């Protein structure tokens, strides 16, 4: 095979001693400093354009380029508004047609009233000229007033049908989009996820689908009603007198031009805002899912700033969008008022010329007033439609993407009897997300059926890639993989994955019971449809085989125990054993073990390894291992170095060869002579002793007491303050959820976000008031205009003069409205986007401030919190920006209109005002119902979003289990539940909304009947009547408009209460508290004095039971023991993630609970089992170890050299500026771990905590890193938790834990001589040559 020209020419022996280097060798002219300076863009979550992809893959041959492109390319969907309805069923479309007709009919009701109004105007003139009697006048007046009542009833029914129908259809279609989106996500190839963060999926499935729902629900009905009003009004105008109507229609062209020109900018800004929020969501998801790491390093501030970078970008585009909408609204109001002026001016000329009469002009003018006013109601909704289209384009681009490797496809063959012979022929592999690195080069390997083949080698050498290729997570760029002589590309993918069981290095469990988690292994197997009894037997049998049965039965709920999100309620070893049980329960033909026992302690590993050895008999097994003791008995051991096979053979053959394998063995060898005790005896002993307790959180805190009597008595004797505070804390948590806030408190709280904008907000309020006063002023001009047109023919000269004057006044009013509306639009855009920015930023910081116990609660899962950040902050803006400005504007309109009406005709005004309280009551009641509905709906969507996030972040496990259909069933069930719950609430709230909107007709009927009577008696003149009526019409409509914003206000109230609760929550261990003694220097003595501990979320499970432990300054101590025995808990207590229930942890004789937590933690550094990296460059990730930015490059380089990662970093094209991807996805486990170690070392800590710090490293790297850690530990107090005993044999003291107590302690030599528990653990990990 021809190698690419960029590949280094030589493969020297050093390669076996370090990570595989990047084949694209960096330019020698680039200095270290320059590399560090090159800041990489975190664009891992952006969908790539074809041009971007071609540029990235330009260095590869064409056929390789095509293979990688297929795995990465996301089509760009040009979404239109119609695209949003692509999943509407025939019933949906019929319902849409019905409710659309109802909306249109409801819109036609208001212009029909102008016909009645024009008719009455003629009647008023007749009575004034004594052409009809008072009785005749009264009869006509009563009949027309009844017509108003009929119109009101019709509009009530039509609006109710329209609102309920649109909300129902909107929710129904959005539900399908959510389901299709998750379905599409689950069908994508793994390379797609290497580019897409889990946080972005959460943002799409919550915030973006909510935007679509907003754009296809009740706002469509409101818009259709407004448009119908507009067109009906103009049709009526044309029927009455076409010339005048035609002249006024010219303004429509101006409106269309304004809306069309501005909406292009609106759509672009909306799209860019969503992109920025998606990237921010991924950062938030990364940080929240690794909160322990962020807390340990005190990097909350730095990570919050990283999140804010994306928020600022979103704020920039959001402001542009809102400003353009403000200017558009101002322009439309100006055009509308100019239209009035034009109508009056030309109408007066047609009247004088005898071409039409007063009745027709009044009808046309009023129709134009109402029609033009209604178009203003369309503008606020255009933003919702634009956002929906932008969100739709992003979601549909994923839905329409045809995956290169599609697990949902029915294509491909199956093999009737699988034997299990696997062959890799001429494999060359490049990961799609890192096209510059060749991971595998010319691999030829046969895995015989029924045999065990082990893969070993340095991390990053391509071992796990074998699993990825066999499972078809990726397609190789050259060569093929064969199963029983058939190319796996020709086989059905779902069927293929069902023949293979995979246990990976970091096991993923789902948020359900232990029983259901193991049962997932049966998907697609013949046993899946057996009886419940048979399935139960299989599951228990698999759990026993995997050495999980005993610990499961030790749990209060046994197999029905819920494991929590991603299994966080179990320790690493417990999770791993459940995963093994899941893998073997279906008796698979092919078993893949990718570091399957790496998370187990030595005792468990011995038994589980024996179980795996038994399970692998008679089936094809591929084992990937760093710990070589686990693969001694393999039929063939393949050593992979630098993406190539270096050597292969049995353990004995390879040891005799004295090649690379022997070097790996030597690195892990424990140099002690051991007795003759057989491993079998140790295994039997292990089975007897394995009973122990789970060491992590569960659901709720009831009390701080122990059910265990001895311990309870002990606690009663101590009766510490902390034990009491734990009880109080649990009670406080119970109360937290019940906290209710008054509306005033919440408004003050929301206003606090805009404190810096107070002055410009006052300007905005000033302009909003001026804008609001425009409507009543227009009523005065309108009444004056009608009075002018009522003048008799003898005064036509004065009529022309007055008409000219009032037409000019309308033009002036239009110009004033252009300035005031645009100004308030721009001002509130600044305020609204600042509010969203600060709310997101502060709530993210409030989350990062919380203690670890907060994140252990099931309702605070990563998905729920990420979803909260994306959706609730958007809802909060329901009382800011455009909404707040509009509410203030229409409130001013209502107040000024009613005041003017009272000033000019108090009798008629008082009668009309009497109806306004009823309107207000309807609106407020609807607001209250929507707030209730919002709270309930949010909870349902939150749980479904959290579930979707969990499924996506575990995509490899979902894919290998072929669990896609099961995930979809649960998700669709959650969506259906939510839809059923919301329908009843919608029906109630829509009833009140329809009432509040149609009540204005009853108000008009009353006003016309009573006012007409006053006019008929000669008590009022035409000016007073028309002024009062038009003021009340617009006043009532304004009240109706305020309540059309109720959904936004309802959401805002619900969101504000959630925010207030989060902000008011003061954690027990508060990083923002200045209290406590600050430590300038630390000696490093650490003591545990009779420490008892249970996790707050699982109080019935004791974890530490009277732990006593002393670490002297500079001492290196190691903690070993079975998983779940309390080792990692000890580290967590040293870090003060939790407070002890009784007893205390002391540093230099000081109780750590009385120290300032930030000051205390600054002297510690933690390297945990699962390395956590964040989006950004390698340099950024190393610098997260310190809380300052001005760290010299030399210090960064030194830390990386000490962690044995410097050479690898410098071999990358961008050096320290290399982007690590979402959660460090661009790097191997070993590379990530060494960067995490560099991050700890740059901190120069006095106390070093190593929680399985080298478990992810291969033997070669481990030896070097361990030496570096040993060197780093000098002069430092070091506590190391280890499963691999070769890493801690030089420890000053080794403590052996069992069930929360220390059962043995001493040096490595002393403990071996004791021949106790430690001796047994060492014996199991022996790497002696088998005989």
Curated annotation (Swiss-Prot):
Region annotated Disordered, chain positions: 1-50
ABC transporter domain mapped to chain residues: 422-667, 1086-1324
Top-level division of the source organism's lineage: Eukaryota
Keyword list, A-Z: ATP-binding, Cell membrane, Glycoprotein, Membrane, Nucleotide-binding, Repeat, Transmembrane, Transmembrane helix, Transport
A GO CC term attached to the entry: plasma membrane
PROSITE patterns listed in its UniProt record: ABC_TM1F, ABC_TRANSPORTER_1, ABC_TRANSPORTER_2
One term of GO molecular function: ATP binding
Catalytic activity reported: itraconazole(in) + ATP + H2O = itraconazole(out) + ADP + phosphate + H(+)
InterPro entries: AAA+_ATPase, ABC1_TM_dom, ABC1_TM_sf, ABC_transporter-like_ATP-bd, ABC_transporter-like_CS, P-loop_NTPase, Type_1_exporter
ABC transmembrane type-1 domain ranges (all copies): 97-387, 764-1051
One Pfam entry name: ABC_tran
Phenotype on disruption: Impairs the resistance to itraconazole of the azole-resistant strain TIMM20092.
Binding residues annotated for ATP, in chain numbering: 457-464, 1121-1128
Claim: Nucleotide-binding is one of the keywords in the record: yes
Residue ranges that the Swiss-Prot or TrEMBL entry lists as coiled coil: none
Stimuli inducing this protein: Expression is induced upon exposure to amphotericin B, the allylamine terbinafine, and itraconazole. Is highly over-expressed in strain TIMM20092, and azole-resistant strain isolated in Switzerland.
Principal subcellular localisation of the protein: membrane
Sites where a glycan is attached: 293, 529, 860, 1108
UniProt GO BP: oligopeptide export from mitochondrion
PANTHER family registered for this protein in UniProt: ATP-BINDING CASSETTE SUB-FAMILY B MEMBER 10, MITOCHONDRIAL, ATP-DEPENDENT PERMEASE MDL1, MITOCHONDRIAL
Record function comment: ABC-type efflux transporter involved in the modulation susceptibility to itraconazole.
Additional note from the record: Dermatophytes showing reduced sensitivity to antifungal agents have emerged in several countries and, in particular, up-regulation of MDR2 expression in some clinical isolates such as strain TIMM20092 leads to increased resistance to itraconazole during clinical treatments.
Assigned protein family: Belongs to the ABC transporter superfamily. ABCB family. Multidrug resistance exporter (TC 3.A.1.201) subfamily.
Descriptive protein name: ABC multidrug transporter MDR2
């Amino acid at each position: 095979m021809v190698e690419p020209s960029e590949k280094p020419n030589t493969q020297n022996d050093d390669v076996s001693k370090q990570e595989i280097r990047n084949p694209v060798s960096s330019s020698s002219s680039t200095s270290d400093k320059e590399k560090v300076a090159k800041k990489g863009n975190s664009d891992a979550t952006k969908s790539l354009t074809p041009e971007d992809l071609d540029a990235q893959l330009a260095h590869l041959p064409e056929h390789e380029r095509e293979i990688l492109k297929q795995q990465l390319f996301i089509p760009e969907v040009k979404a239109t508004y119609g695209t949003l309805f692509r999943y509407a069923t025939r019933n949906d479309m019929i319902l849409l047609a019905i409710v659309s007709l109802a909306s249109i009919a409801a819109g036609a009701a208001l212009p029909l009233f102008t016909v009645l109004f024009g008719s009455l105007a003629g009647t008023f003139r007749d009575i004034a000229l004594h052409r009809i009697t008072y009785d005749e006048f009264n009869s006509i007046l009563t009949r027309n007033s009844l017509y108003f009542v009929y119109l009101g009833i019709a509009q009530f029914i039509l609006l109710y049908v329209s609102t309920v129908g649109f909300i129902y259809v909107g929710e129904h279609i959005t539900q399908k989009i959510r389901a299709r989106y998750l379905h599409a996500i689950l069908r994508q190839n793994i390379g797609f996820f290497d580019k897409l963060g889990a946080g972005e999926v959460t943002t799409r499935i919550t915030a973006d689908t909510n935007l679509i729902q907003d754009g296809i629900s009740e706002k469509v009905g409101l818009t259709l009603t407004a448009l119908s009003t507009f067109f009906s009004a103009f049709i009526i105008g044309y029927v009455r007198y076409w010339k005048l109507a035609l002249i006024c229609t010219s303004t429509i062209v101006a409106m269309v031009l304004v809306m069309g020109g501005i909406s292009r900018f609106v759509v672009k800004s909306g799209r860019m805002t969503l992109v920025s929020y998606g990237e921010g969501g991924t950062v938030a998801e990364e940080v929240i899912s690794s909160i322990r790491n962020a807390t340990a390093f005190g990097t909350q501030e730095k990570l919050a700033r990283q999140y804010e970078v994306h928020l600022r970008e979103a704020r920039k585009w959001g402001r542009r969008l809102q400003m353009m909408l403000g200017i558009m609204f101002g322009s439309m109001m100006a055009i509308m008022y100019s239209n009035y002026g034009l109508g009056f001016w030309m109408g007066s000329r047609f009247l004088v010329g005898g071409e039409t009469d007063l009745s027709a002009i009044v009808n046309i003018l009023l129709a134009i007033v109402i029609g033009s006013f209604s178009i203003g109601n369309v503008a606020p909704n255009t933003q919702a439609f634009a956002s929906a289209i932008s969100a739709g384009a992003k979601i549909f681009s994923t839905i329409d993407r045809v995956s290169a490797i599609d697990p949902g496809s029915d294509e491909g063959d199956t093999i009737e009897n699988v034997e299990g012979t696997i062959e890799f022929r001429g494999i060359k592999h490049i990961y799609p997300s890192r096209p510059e690195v060749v991971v595998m080069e010319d691999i030829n390997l046969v895995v015989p059926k029924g045999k065990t083949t082990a893969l070993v080698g340095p991390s990053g050498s391509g071992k796990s890639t074998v699993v990825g290729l066999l499972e078809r997570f990726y397609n190789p760029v050259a060569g093929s993989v064969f199963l029983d002589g058939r190319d796996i590309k020709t086989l059905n993918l779902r069927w293929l994955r069902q023949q293979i069981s995979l246990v990976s290095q970091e096991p993923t469990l789902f948020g359900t019971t232990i029983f259901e988690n193991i049962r997932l292994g049966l998907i697609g197997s013949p046993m899946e449809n057996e009886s419940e009894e048979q399935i139960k037997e299989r599951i228990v049998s698999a759990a026993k085989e995997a050495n999980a049965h005993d610990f499961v039965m030790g749990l209060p709920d046994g197999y029905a125990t819920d494991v929590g999100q991603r299994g966080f309620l179990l320790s690493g070893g417990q999770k791993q054993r459940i995963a093994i049980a899941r893998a073997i329960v279906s008796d698979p033909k092919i078993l893949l073990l990718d570091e399957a026992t790496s998370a187990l302690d030595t005792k468990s590993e011995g038994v589980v390894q024996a179980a795996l050895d038994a399970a692998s008999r008679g089936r094809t097994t591929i084992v990937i291992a760093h710990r070589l003791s686990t693969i001694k008995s393999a039929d063939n051991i393949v050593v992979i170095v630098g993406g190539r096979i270096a050597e292969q053979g049995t353990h004995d053959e390879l040891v005799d060869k004295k090649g690379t394998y022997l070097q790996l063995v030597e690195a892990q060898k424990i140099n002690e002579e051991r007795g003759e005790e057989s491993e079998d005896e140790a295994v039997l002993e292990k089975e007897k002793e394995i009973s122990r307790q789970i060491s992590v959180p569960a659901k709720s805190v009831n009390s701080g007491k122990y059910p265990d009597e001895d311990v309870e008595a002990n606690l009663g004797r101590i009766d510490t303050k902390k034990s009491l505070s734990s009880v109080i804390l649990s009670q406080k948590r119970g109360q937290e959820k019940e906290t209710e806030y008054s509306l005033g408190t919440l408004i003050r709280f929301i206003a606090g976000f805009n404190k810096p904008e107070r002055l410009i907000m006052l300007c905005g309020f000033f302009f909003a008031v001026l804008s609001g006063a425009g409507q009543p002023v227009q009523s005065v001009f309108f009444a004056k205009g009608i009075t002018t047109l009522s003048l008799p023919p003898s005064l036509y000269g004065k009529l022309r003069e007055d008409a000219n004057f009032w037409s000019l006044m309308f033009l002036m009013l239009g110009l004033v409205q252009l300035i005031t509306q645009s100004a308030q639009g721009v001002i509130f855009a600044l305020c609204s986007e600042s509010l969203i920015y600060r709310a997101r930023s502060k709530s993210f910081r409030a989350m990062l401030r919380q203690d670890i116990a907060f994140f252990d609660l099931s309702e605070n899962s990563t998905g729920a919190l990420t979803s909260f950040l994306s959706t609730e902050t958007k809802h909060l803006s329901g009382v800011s920006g455009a909404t707040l400005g509009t509410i203030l504007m229409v409130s001013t309109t209502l107040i000024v209109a009613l005041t003017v009406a009272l000033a000019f005709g108090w009798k008629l005004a008082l009668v009309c005002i009497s109806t306004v309280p009823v309107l207000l009551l309807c609106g407020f009641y609807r607001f209250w119902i929507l707030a209730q509905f919002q709270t309930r709906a949010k909870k349902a969507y939150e749980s479904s979003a959290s579930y979707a996030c969990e499924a996506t972040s575990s995509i490899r496990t979902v894919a290998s289990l072929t669990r896609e259909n099961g995930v979809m069933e649960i998700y669709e069930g959650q969506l259906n539940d939510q839809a059923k719950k919301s329908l009843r609430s919608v029906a109630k709230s829509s009833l009140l909304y329809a009432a509040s909107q149609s009540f204005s007709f009853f108000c008009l009927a009353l006003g016309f009947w009573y006012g007409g009577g006053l006019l008929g008696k000669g008590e009022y003149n035409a000016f007073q009547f028309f002024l009062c009526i038009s003021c009340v019409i617009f006043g009532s409509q304004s009240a109706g408009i305020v309540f059309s914003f109720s959904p936004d206000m309802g959401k805002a109230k619900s969101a504000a209460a959630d925010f207030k609760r989060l902000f008011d929550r003061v954690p027990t261990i508060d990083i923002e508290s200045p209290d406590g003694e600050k430590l300038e220097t630390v000696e490093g003595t650490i003591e545990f004095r009779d420490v008892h501990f249970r996790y707050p979320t699982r109080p019935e499970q004791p974890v530490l039971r009277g732990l006593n432990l002393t670490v002297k300054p500079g001492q290196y101590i190691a903690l070993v023991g079975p998983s779940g025995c309390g080792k990692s808990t000890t580290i967590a207590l040293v870090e003060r993630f939790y407070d002890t229930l009784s007893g205390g942890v002391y540093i230099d004789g000081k109780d750590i609970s009385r120290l300032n937590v930030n000051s205390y933690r600054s002297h510690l550094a933690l390297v945990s089992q699962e390395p956590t990296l964040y989006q950004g460059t390698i340099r950024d990730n190393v610098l997260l170890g310190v809380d300052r930015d001005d760290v010299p490059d030399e210090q960064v380089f030194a830390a990386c050299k000490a962690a044995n990662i410097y050479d690898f970093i410098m071999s990358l094209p961008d050096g320290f500026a290399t982007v690590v991807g979402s959660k460090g996805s661009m790097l191997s486990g070993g590379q990530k771990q060494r960067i995490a170690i560099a991050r700890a070392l740059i901190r120069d800590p006095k106390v070093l905590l190593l929680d399985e710090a080298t478990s992810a490293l291969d033997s070669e790297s481990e030896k070097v890193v361990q030496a570096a850690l040993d060197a780093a530990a000098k002069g430092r107090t070091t506590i190391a938790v280890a499963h691999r005993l070769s890493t801690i044999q030089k420890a000053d003291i080794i403590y052996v834990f069992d069930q929360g107590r220390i059962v043995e302690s001493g040096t490595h030599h002393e403990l071996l001589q004791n021949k106790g528990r430690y001796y047994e653990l060492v014996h199991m990990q022996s790497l002696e040559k088998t005989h």
